């Protein structure tokens, strides 16, 4: 399995340029590029061509643009903005050689029926699939384990992906989000591993379902999530692609970027290596 770095892990103590240099130094294979902050910051002083050249001349490669945010159940103006943003992302993907865009569902205090959420999500993802197909880009739906997210369990997200029925539309499986809203491990064991495009690894303090927030994440293997169950299930269903470490821990932002990136790799590999070999 290949190792990826999600830039949320150094959100407040690094930038894209430094993330790339340190991930290259410490042997990461991939990086998920944050499009809402770190990429725009980089582009103030560099071009996309500069970034493409960096990837061309180094081991580390771009895995995904993270993320197309709140894509479903939008008003007409919001919908048009999502489509426009996604089309722009496709050009970025083409320039950099990115194969995935992470799509995050709407988070809202408004109550929306699950049927309406599924209908909107499937319709938008189908349109995005059509747009992405000529670029060879895949869309990875990331359910978010929070009560106010419109798609907040593995089962709900998997049902939407099945409704879309496109080869280039799949899931992000995030251990934190899976745990945070009580998704069922049996559902993962029965899933098609080909529908899981990216695995986000993390861990968390032991708060009740519905109370967990991103800031509660801790280094893999140092929290309450049964990562052994997640990893063994992923292996069982044939997933063996990329594991991406994603944390949002405020106290980790107080470390040096290098210490964060190094520790993230060490703790991830210690957990994952029990089930998957590191690919050369």
Swiss-Prot record:
Q: Name one GO molecular function term.
A: isomerase activity
Q: Name the SUPFAM superfamilies for this protein.
A: Xylose isomerase-like
InterPro entries, from UniProt? IolE/XylAMocC-like, Xyl_isomerase-like_sf, Xyl_isomerase-like_TIM-brl
Identify the residues that bind a divalent metal cation: 142, 174, 200, 246
Pfam assignment, any one: AP_endonuc_2
Q: Which reaction does it catalyse?
A: scyllo-inosose = scyllo-inosine
Which Gene3D superfamilies does the protein's record reference? Divalent-metal-dependent TIM barrel enzymes
Q: In the UniProt record, does the keyword Zinc-finger occur?
A: no
* Cofactor(s) demanded: a divalent metal cation
Identify the EC number(s).
5.3.99.11
Query: Which pathway is this protein assigned to?
Result: Polyol metabolism; myo-inositol degradation into acetyl-CoA
- Give the UniProt keywords, A-Z: Isomerase, Metal-binding
- How many cofactors are bound and how? Binds 1 divalent metal cation per subunit.
Name the source's superkingdom.
Answer: Bacteria
Family, similarity comment: Belongs to the IolI family.
Q: What does this protein do?
A: Involved in the reversible interconverion of 2-keto-myo-inositol (2KMI, inosose or 2,4,6/3,5-pentahydroxycyclohexanone) to 1-keto-D-chiro-inositol (1KDCI or 2,3,5/4,6-pentahydroxycyclohexanone).
Q: What is this protein called?
A: Inosose isomerase
Q: Taxonomically, what lineage is the organism?
A: Bacteria, Bacillati, Bacillota, Bacilli, Bacillales
């Amino acid at each position: 399995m290949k190792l990826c770095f999600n830039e949320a892990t150094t959100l407040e103590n690094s930038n894209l340029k430094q993330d790339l240099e340190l991930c290259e130094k410490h042997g990461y294979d991939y990086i998920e590029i944050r499009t809402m902050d770190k990429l725009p910051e980089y582009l103030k002083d560099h071009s996309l061509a500069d970034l493409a050249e960096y990837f061309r001349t180094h081991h580390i490669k771009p895995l995904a643009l993270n993320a197309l945010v709140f894509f479903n159940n939008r008003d007409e103006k919001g919908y048009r903005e999502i489509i426009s943003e996604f089309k722009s992302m496709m050009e970025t993907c083409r320039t950099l050689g990115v194969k995935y865009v992470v799509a995050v569902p709407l988070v809202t205090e408004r109550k929306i029926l699950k049927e309406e959420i599924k209908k909107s999500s499937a319709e938008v993802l189908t349109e995005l699939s059509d747009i992405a197909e000529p670029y060879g880009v895949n869309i990875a739906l990331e359910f978010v384990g929070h009560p106010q997210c419109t798609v907040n369990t593995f089962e709900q997200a998997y049902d939407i992906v099945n409704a879309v029925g496109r080869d280039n539309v799949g899931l992000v499986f995030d251990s934190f989000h899976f745990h945070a809203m009580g998704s069922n491990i049996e559902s993962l064991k029965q899933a098609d591993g080909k529908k899981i495009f990216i695995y986000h690894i993390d861990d968390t303090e032991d708060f009740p379902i519905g109370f967990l927030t991103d800031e509660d994440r801790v280094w893999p293997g140092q929290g309450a999530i049964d990562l052994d169950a997640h990893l063994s299930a992923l292996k069982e269903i044939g997933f063996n692609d990329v594991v991406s470490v994603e944390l949002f821990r405020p106290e980790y932002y107080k470390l040096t970027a290098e210490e964060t990136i190094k520790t993230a790799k060490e703790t991830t590999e210690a957990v994952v290596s029990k089930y998957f070999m590191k690919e050369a």
